[in-house]
């Protein structure tokens, strides 16, 4: 999944001092996934005491990677993350070098869920302009000490924030792995689909797989799956990832159909059985 760039169990890492940023916090969290010990040195500039550190990240205004040292920053001439209009940050540059390039699907999901949002946030770019979800690490800056706190505790607090970020990142990674595991099952269900209505025997993360299958065409229009509240849900299919625009709307009149307990936002309808849900979904598609 991720590889060490420096073959050591214990490494010294320099990041910038002052305010906490998701960029440098995420860098440390990522390194802690592959190194047993990560010693963090927070400085306002690289000096003779720190210039030989194993990693120098988000500070220094230079990129230089050797087998003994990794220096990555983004405050020099801006660079774009490949295939996007999002500017690089130190975390995106570090991830780019550490992630397994052959695990294409995992990389795609990780970039969409974590890397691109963190980079956009750090560079002051608007998430919505790029169809991105907000950064899952937006809490980082809010965790800094107040002016009345003992500033000697700043590094200790930084470590606490890194641990919080690690919990988030580990959960994102697990969610992605579980999502990838579901792809084959969703694909098999798509093969059996009839009339634009996809029926899942159990809830699975289906959105990405269905959007990819549709490829800009309304092949799958509605998805039915068991609800964790009992019964079955009908849900509309978004036209593209991160969009509320769908191929069709669920009309209010669906609430009058047999077995329906209600609908929400023209995007969901709730039924007591899969049979009633399928019957309703086919009617919705036919009448659209």
Predicted features and spans:
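Acidic/histidine-rich
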Residues: 172-253
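Hydrophobic, aromatic-enriched interface-forming segments
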Residues: 116-205
């Amino acid at each position: 999944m991720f590889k060490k760039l420096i073959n050591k169990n214990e490494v010294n890492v320099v990041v910038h001092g002052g305010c906490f940023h998701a960029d440098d916090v995420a860098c440390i969290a990522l390194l802690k996934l592959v190194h047993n010990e990560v010693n963090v040195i927070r400085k306002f500039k690289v000096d003779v005491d720190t210039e030989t550190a194993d990693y120098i990240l988000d500070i220094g205004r230079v990129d230089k990677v050797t087998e003994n040292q990794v220096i990555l920053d983004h405050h020099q001439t801006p660079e774009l993350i490949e295939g996007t209009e999002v500017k690089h940050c130190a975390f995106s540059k570090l991830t780019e070098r550490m992630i397994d390039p052959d695990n294409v699907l995992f990389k795609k999901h990780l970039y969409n869920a974590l890397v691109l949002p963190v980079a956009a946030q750090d560079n002051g770019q608007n998430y919505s302009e790029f169809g991105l979800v907000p950064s899952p690490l937006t809490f980082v800056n809010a965790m800094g000490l107040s002016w009345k706190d003992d500033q000697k505790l700043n590094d200790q607090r930084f470590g606490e924030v890194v641990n919080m970020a690690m919990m988030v990142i580990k959960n994102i990674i697990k969610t992605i792995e579980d999502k990838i595991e579901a792809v084959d099952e969703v694909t098999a269900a798509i093969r059996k689909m009839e009339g634009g209505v996809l029926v899942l025997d159990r809830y699975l993360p289906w959105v990405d797989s269905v959007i990819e299958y549709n490829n800009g065409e309304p092949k799958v229009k509605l998805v039915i799956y068991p609800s964790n509240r009992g019964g079955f849900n009908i849900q509309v299919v978004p036209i593209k990832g991160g969009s509320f625009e769908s191929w069709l709307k669920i009309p209010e009149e669906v609430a009058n159909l047999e077995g329906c307990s209600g609908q929400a936002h023209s995007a969901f309808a709730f039924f007591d059985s899969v049979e009633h849900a399928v019957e309703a979904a086919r009617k919705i598609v036919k009448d659209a």
